[in-house]
Amino acid sequence: MAAVVSAKPLCDSEPAIPAPPSVKEDNSNDTKDPEENSNDGSQPAKRRRMSGDSTPSCENSNQDFGSSYFPAENVIEYKWPPDETGEYYMLQEQVSEYLGVTSFKRKYPDLERRDLSHKEKLYLRELNVITETQCTLGLTALRSDEVIDLMIKEYPAKHAEYSVILQEKERQRITDHYKEYSQLQQQNTQKVEAGKVPEYIKKAAKKAAEFNSNLNRERMEERRAYFDLQTHIIQVPQGKYKILPSEMTKVSPYPVSLIPGQFQEYYKRYSPNELRYLPLNTALYEPPLDPLDPELLALDSDGDSDEVEEMKSEKKKTKGSSVRLSIDSSSMNMSESDNTQDTQEETPQPRPKVKEKSSTPRKEGSKRSVLSKSVSGYKPKSIPNAICGICLKGKDANKKGRSERLIHCSQCDNSGHPSCLDMSAELVAVIKKYPWQCMECKTCIICGQPHHEEEMMFCDTCDRGYHTFCVGLGALPSGRWICDCCQKVPATPKKGARKVKNSKEG
């Protein structure tokens, strides 16, 4: 029993050295029972055979383990092809021996592998990685990054051992490189002449300047922005701005009023053209048109903008002439009122009021100019062979088969029967007194613009067009609407007053 116990530690001990036959076995064999020794010798022989069989089996296992041991420094990582485009590989045979895996390909079939070419084998032979006999065999290459990942996941102890070897190799490489550099430096210092030192200094300064310029250029072009790992924000350099002198940016003693009515030095200067758009009392100009309005763009593309400008110029001319006529008529009325006071009481004549509404003086003048233009001897257009645009018939027959005169647009050649246009006789009588416009040519009386058709409304008495914002309305009115021109038409004198005047004159 002592021999069996002594054999187990030998199997668990270091595998390199086999255990010699112990003295305890001989002593145990000598001190056995005399009955066993008195036998034919078969029993002791059997026991010797069993003990002899058990001990060599342990020795064989130790020898196998010792032969399978592969040190980490023998695992070589190389680059193929050796130029800049190469990748790092390891030999599958070395990795399998180091990890102790016999069937490495069957155990890890997903790893990327390839067969070594003849040139690659010769390259490894020059590096003393493989022997001449291994050059004739079929070798397999594995990607080094996949092997390292496999060792980290499944063989951490092997990876720790291999990483220590890599660190030692890196230290040795740095040491050798430093030794070579120091030797070259010693050789160069011995060869340097005293007269060439200024030239070397200039070359060193030039190279340093080139390096600094390249570094600054990379910072400005390639590495301007960077990612902040703490805030996860991409930081971008701020742009350059021109700085004004301190005299121009100096703050005044009263920069802004803190309470309403307090003095402040800052104020905005408005031009006369800008003030006409502001509602100080009432805006004199209509709201400015949107330059990106599709209707306005289409109008400009069709060439109608010239017609609109001509209409504006004509209205300005007629406006000036109407103002002169109104002033002349007012002066004539003033002289007549001074001479004939009794006739003024019987036949009152309308006198233009200058300040009828303090808020809208210019609008009243423009409306009166339109009224005077429409009243002063206007004759409607006459087209002999005109055709109604609705029923497509002439003046001999309308849509009801009756003869009816056509009304004509003052801007274009469109014509139509009043019955087809749903116009009453009173409206037709008023239309003939001023240049009437059809629906396609209709413009606002105040601003003279054809735009904003959805905000255009028409007088029920004279059919003139007005924008809601030109007359101060927020929306289209519902029901009957009469413009100011029709509401302020001067009253016609009575027949009795005319007879009295004639009798007095007679």
From Swiss-Prot:
A zinc finger (PHD-type) spans 387-444, 446-489. Pfam families: PHD. Residues 52-66 have a biased composition (Polar residues). InterPro entries: PHF10_PHD_finger_1, Znf_FYVE_PHD, Znf_PHD, Znf_PHD-finger, Znf_RING/FYVE/PHD. It is found in: Nucleus. PROSITE patterns: ZF_PHD_1, ZF_PHD_2. GO terms for cellular component: npBAF complex. Residues 90-299 are annotated as: SAY. It comes from the Eukaryota. Residues 23-35, 353-367 have a biased composition (Basic and acidic residues). Residues 1-66, 293-377 are annotated as: Disordered. Keywords: Metal-binding, Neurogenesis, Nucleus, Repeat, Transcription, Transcription regulation, Zinc, Zinc-finger. GO terms for molecular function: zinc ion binding. Residues 326-338 have a biased composition (Low complexity). One of its GO terms (biological process) is nervous system development. Involved in transcription activity regulation by chromatin remodeling in the context of the neural progenitors-specific chromatin remodeling complex (npBAF complex). May play a role in the proliferation of neural progenitors. Belongs to the SAYP family. Component of neural progenitors-specific chromatin remodeling complex (npBAF complex), a subfamily of ATP-dependent SWI/SNF chromatin remodeling complexes. This is PHD finger protein 10. It comes from Xenopus laevis (African clawed frog).
